[in-house]
């Protein structure tokens, strides 16, 4: 298998994996009982934590949909041999995982003691998600580097051919 094929597999993996974790995030229960609205989180005095908890579904939706779109953009860039698109994908995955890690870190601090085992599940999901994404990044970067080197070689040949044509016409 060549680096291009690995990059395509990374794109497929990224879209499917992001979709899977997006579904997990949307189906996560934070309240139990309909009348009492018993929350698994304690009340926090931090505005950032409260805002993150309140807008978690919107943040997850925005990040996941952006990642899926950028994953599809990765397919296009691999097909058209655009190395800059592969680098954009790599930078986005790093940003995406750091934001998700920050959210898990913030929200695990306010989980009630009765639900602490749930925080371990959050950590396992987050760390496995990060490891899987970060394991794939070297293949993307290597393919981008190969495309960059290839474009430099083609540029030199084109300049050499253009200079030869101008010299013959003179």
Swiss-Prot record:
The chain crosses the membrane at residues 59-79, 86-106, 121-141. It is found in: Membrane. One of its GO terms (cellular component) is membrane. InterPro entries: DUF4534. Its main location: membrane. Keywords: Membrane, Signal, Transmembrane, Transmembrane helix. Residues 80-85, 142-170 are cytoplasmic. Residues 22-58, 107-120 are lumenal. Pfam families: DUF4534 (PF15049). It is a multi-pass membrane protein. Residues 1-21 form the signal peptide. Found in the 3'UTR of TMEM217/ AC Q8N7C4. Cotranscriptional with TMEM217 and seems to be only ever transcribed from the same promoter region. This is Transmembrane protein 217B. It comes from Homo sapiens (Human). The lineage of its organism: Eukaryota, Metazoa, Chordata, Craniata, Vertebrata.
């Amino acid at each position: 298998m060549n680096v291009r094929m690995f990059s395509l597999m990374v794109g497929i993996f990224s879209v499917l994996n992001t979709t899977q974790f997006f579904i997990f995030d949307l189906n996560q229960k934070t309240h139990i009982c309909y009348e009492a609205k018993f929350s698994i989180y304690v009340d926090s005095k931090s505005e950032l934590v409260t805002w993150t908890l309140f807008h978690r579904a919107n943040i997850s939706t925005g990040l996941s949909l952006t990642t899926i779109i950028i994953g599809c953009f990765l397919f296009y860039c691999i097909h058209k041999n655009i190395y800059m698109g592969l680098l954009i994908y790599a930078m986005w995955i790093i940003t995406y995982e750091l934001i998700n890690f920050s959210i898990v870190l913030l929200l695990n601090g306010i989980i009630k003691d009765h639900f602490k085992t749930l925080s371990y599940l959050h950590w396992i999901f987050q760390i496995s998600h990060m490891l899987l994404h970060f394991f794939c990044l070297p293949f993307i970067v290597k393919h981008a580097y190969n495309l960059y080197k290839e474009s430099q070689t083609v540029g030199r040949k084109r300049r050499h051919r253009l200079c030869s044509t101008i010299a013959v016409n003179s």
